[in-house]
Amino acid sequence: MLQSLKNVFFSETTTTTTTSTTTPVSNSAIKRYIGNINDYKNANYFNYYRILENKYDYLRDTFGLKTFSNNETFKLIDFTIDSEMNNTCITSIWNQKYSNNSSIPVEGIYKIPLAPYSVISGFTVEYQDKVFIGKIKSKEKAQNQYSDSIASGGQAFLAEKTQDGQFSFRIGNLPPNENVTIHLTIISGVCPHLSSLQNCFHRFLFPNYSFNFQFNLNIKLTLPIKTIELLYYPNREIKFKENSNNKEATLTFSSKNGIDSDIVCIVEPENDIERPQSIIEHSKLNNTYAVSVNFTPSFSHLTSDDVNQKSEFIFLIDCSGSMSGEPIKKAKRALEIIIRSLNENCKFNIYCFGSRFTKAFDNSKMYNDETLAQISGYVEKIDADLGGTELLPPIRDILSTESDFEYPRQLFILTDGEVSERDSLINYVATESNNTRIFTYGIGNSVDTELVIGLSKACKGYYEMIKDNSNFEEQVMKLVSIAFEPTLSNIKVDWGTELQIEQGPTKIRPLYSGETLIVYALLKDNKIPQSTVQVSLIGDGPTGSKLEFPITLDFSKTIDYENNSVHTLAAFNIIKDLEEVERKGNHSNNRDRIEELGKSYGLISKYTSYIVTAASEQVTEETMKTLNIIQTPTTTTTTSHSNRRREEADHTMNQTLLKNCAVVDDLFESCEMLSETSIKFECNRVYKKIPSSLSKIFSFFSSLSTSSSVRSEVVSNFDNDIESEEKKNNSINNNSDSLLKLIKLQKANGSWSSPFSEFKIDLSKKPSNIDSDDIWITLIVINKILNDYPTQQSQYDLVIQKASKWVKQQLTRLNIPNQYGSLLATSKLHI
């Protein structure tokens, strides 16, 4: 996030009128993790498919139309997708034709993975020149109607969405040797990634064999389009519509050989960083209106001195027995640095967990000198003495506390282990992604990687895998720097008094750097204003002031999307909010409203399912083939899974150890045939290459030499190198300890104050235009840290930033705001 601190704080000029250089704020720290707009696999929206890829190697063969035995009765022949993209929605019409090779009546099952931002709003099934259209009914009625129809020899389809996000429906009594065509309408929220809007069809949606495929995408945006790209498939055709000011375009692609990679369309529009975009959709079906608003602000014009935002920081530290020794020492040191990097606009707290958990405060407290001293005392007592690794109880304690949208909650989790019921834990935190962003650190080689990645991705955060303790603090501070980047929080849409709306989502997640806001709303009545309506997007800006972005809704320019995509996604998000209220046990009965929305817009929900039934013209007399469905392996991680992972890790470690031991063994066998001089040369040469973990083994083998002089020299060289390495490490540790001592003396406001005893400061050299000893002391300490610890810059970036900001505030108070650079240069002469 910061440029080189020496470039920031020092100017080439030494005159008293020097203007200090400030650091522009950007999302460069985030881009180190997610790359550019083409790195779609690092985008938040792709996490659902990432989980599919990691868990199920064979899933690709289970999607589509199958029999319950998962055999090759049905085969996809033709597949066409017609999509339309606007600012906030993507509507896709699927047409799939399957051949049916069964010689007897068969019951099939159709499944596809459905991302959490997508909904099925309609489906039909065709065979024998008949068309069966799905209708939404209450879940109980749909199930009963399906069972009755099948029992009487009729055709029936029952569709539901499973808990793991798969849309599926059973098709009963399909006649033999009759082709089947399935039509789906899928409406998705557009997938924003950095400055782009994306549309992704994962390869798991397509069978792993050849079929005819056609993809047509129609793009209609409210802003001009800069670029359009289709990854992996260069033989696509892109055309911009004439007289559309580059706001409309089409993309087409076809294949005779099926699909072997993800289909990812990336559209980059021009960005209006000051004005949210809006769409007003009119539904001809029932003469209603829906609105969507999207906004991707940029704060790149701000400097680090401008940022003065509120936030809540909670740190959850693994204190199980496996963290003993160097890991817990490093964690404590990192915590001491982090808590000095916070500012007085923050709330903060620390949790320690193992078989049980403790916390510094009952609830997060405001950051000041008193609470900083209290929590620093808590950190000093932290040790790896809490037993096992039970992560769910402390996370539940944190997330069950209602978040304050004025202080966006950011949770940092540091662990080196595994947990039981991992996937249940990840699914739980995902339900709180609207109010909490999670950063995770995985320590060492035995940590459950999917736990670390899954927790962060579920809450749109970031993660670090820390394999080497030597870079511990640096890697920790990388994520902390991201947490400090500009944020728009406490966001609300002021719809004014003319519009009666129902908004989804009701509570808007804080808008972090590089993210896009999307909000939907249904107008509650059909009466609309004759003219434009002014509404506004309001939030707390990164400078600490309220920001307001005007939005003009012009009802003379409504759009009639054929599939009511804006209406549908508005209803979908409202249903999610209502279901979430019930999940949290607020004793609200929202069933009637959920069923009403589900039936109006064709949405599967907690209380609604799709059902299609039709009486057969000829009742099927043969026995319908009934086959056992292949059981999908459970997605829940259990203790046995953890044990298996440990066994695999132990096996790998043992094999590596044996392999290296064999290398050393072979070395000394070959040395038996060499002269003493050759032995000296060969042993010393190879010693430098072997892993340090084998040092004792090497010493043992070297003792087998027939010559005591050779043995003594080899062991002596070995010991000298070990001693040299220890001295080097001790030097680094001592340097780090002295830096930490300086950092721990910093006050909550960023200053270092008198009396200061860490090193001698001559207060008599303080310039006359400075009225406070603390200003002079702080300037000198800044110089001291920059000068003495250049290799540890990433650790103290935020600490120095806070200190310099405090000094500049004091200089502004003294009416000398432009003298920061010259005073810093002067103070450098006195360190």
Swiss-Prot record:
One Pfam family linked to the record: VIT
At the top level, the lineage of the source is Eukaryota
* Domain VIT: from-to ranges: 60-188
Q: Where is the VWFA domain?
A: 312-480
Q: Which InterPro entries match?
A: VIT, VWF_A, vWFA_dom_sf
PANTHER family recorded: VON WILLEBRAND FACTOR A DOMAIN-CONTAINING PROTEIN 5A (PTHR45737), VON WILLEBRAND FACTOR A DOMAIN-CONTAINING PROTEIN DDB_G0267758-RELATED (PTHR45737:SF1)
Q: What protein name is recorded for this chain?
A: von Willebrand factor A domain-containing protein DDB_G0285981
